[in-house]
Amino acid sequence: MPTIYRRKTPVVRIGDVWVGSDAPVVVQSMTNTDTADVDSTIKQCIALARAGSELIRVTVNNDDAAKGVPHLVDGLAKIGIHTPIIGDFHYNGHILLKKYPDCAKALAKYRINPGNVSIGRKDDDNFKAMVDVAVENQKPVRIGVNWGSLDQQLLAKMMDQNAKLAEPKEARDVMMEAMIVSALNSAAIAERYGLRKDQIILSAKVSGVQDLIDVYRDLAKRCDYVLHLGLTEAGMGAKGVVASTAGLSVLLLEGIGDTIRVSLTPKPNGDRTEEVLVAQQILQSMAIRSFTPQVTACPGCGRTTSTFFQELAERIQNYIREQMPQWKTRYTGVEEMKVAVMGCVVNGPGESKHANIGISLPGTFEEPKAPVYVDGRLMTTLKGDKIVEEFTTILNEYVDNRYAKKAEEAVGV
């Protein structure tokens, strides 16, 4: 597999999580609860953290939300969850961070949108006020530019300058440039006010895939700040998953991006953790990181008129997901395990041999038996109506025998 060479950046510490080129690409998420409702926000943070989110962002939009942040962080710590909590500020962050110092101290990072803090205007020092609090508390900051809330004064100025050119650029290109200028100018001002380069993360979010790729390629060439990747609004369902994957994977393959968020729109009362799982799957599918054993299963065709292989694949995948909270604390490297559940003789044996453990179920008109391969070799052949239970037992034994010794060595047993 080709090596991905990460773009060189400083490393930013966010709580106990490191983000930058010398650290793994970090998965983050954001709550959609009212932060002032501390109990509901704690509940959602627990779900996101247990799903694997390594950073969690919460909205801090009013006094009650700011008052709730310390209780949120303390409540999570009491149950053993120390995932860094990031405060998302718009319009009034300079007021809230000054007014509620306990909130400023409890948060692990502040997100500032330069498009709505009037940065650069002579009569407005809101941005400086927020940076001053970050410097005082030694907190990192993400300067997050969004095309939907871009500094209109800056954009208008650049549009006017463009209109005077002999060959004006397209409006889309001017907007992309304005986003980059906003991010870089804001970062330079933040450094003048006392933030170090290893305390600054930049993002320039749009909602179109090609726009995302273009703006981050250009931004990456023009600075060495840590970069946060993501579409500002990916959308719902398959559209959101595909758009995020298409955009992020191109940039990640080029070594661009140090932390990612997949901004999926959940269904009403839907599961917020889906965005975490999709982000993890993007990284794992690209062999950038490993989070959980991967189950390979064929899509099925006319040779597989039975649904049994589909049912087995689903049951094994669900079983692995259920076991992972225990497995990852006991077994070193289990997240890299590959399991194959195949439906006929065409690709079944070959795919199973390439996996750590695989089973090739019989297709239509094939002999009713299922060979099981372990580390490329035929181990046994299963028959009858206990295939699920027997294969699960083999899987458990493989995990225990293959990965337990590493865990014992790691703890010095």
UniProtKB/Swiss-Prot annotation:
Pathway: Isoprenoid biosynthesis; isopentenyl diphosphate biosynthesis via DXP pathway; isopentenyl diphosphate from 1-deoxy-D-xylulose 5-phosphate: step 5/6. It holds the Pfam family GcpE. Its EC number is 1.17.7.3. One of its GO terms (biological process) is isopentenyl diphosphate biosynthetic process, methylerythritol 4-phosphate pathway. It catalyses: (2E)-4-hydroxy-3-methylbut-2-enyl diphosphate + oxidized [flavodoxin] + H2O + 2 H(+) = 2-C-methyl-D-erythritol 2,4-cyclic diphosphate + reduced [flavodoxin]. InterPro entries: Dihydropteroate_synth-like_sf, IspG_bac, IspG_bac-typ, NO2/SO3_Rdtase_4Fe4S_sf. It comes from the Bacteria. It is an enzyme of class 1 (oxidoreductase). Keywords: 4Fe-4S, Iron, Iron-sulfur, Isoprene biosynthesis, Metal-binding, Oxidoreductase. [4Fe-4S] cluster binds at C298, C301, C344, E351. GO terms for molecular function: 4 iron, 4 sulfur cluster binding; 4-hydroxy-3-methylbut-2-en-1-yl diphosphate synthase activity (ferredoxin); 4-hydroxy-3-methylbut-2-enyl-diphosphate synthase activity (flavodoxin); iron ion binding. Binds 1 [4Fe-4S] cluster. Its cofactor is [4Fe-4S] cluster. HAMAP family: IspG. Belongs to the IspG family. NCBIfam families: ispG_gcpE, PRK00366.1. Converts 2C-methyl-D-erythritol 2,4-cyclodiphosphate (ME-2,4cPP) into 1-hydroxy-2-methyl-2-(E)-butenyl 4-diphosphate. This is 4-hydroxy-3-methylbut-2-en-1-yl diphosphate synthase (flavodoxin). It comes from Koribacter versatilis (strain Ellin345). The gene is ispG.
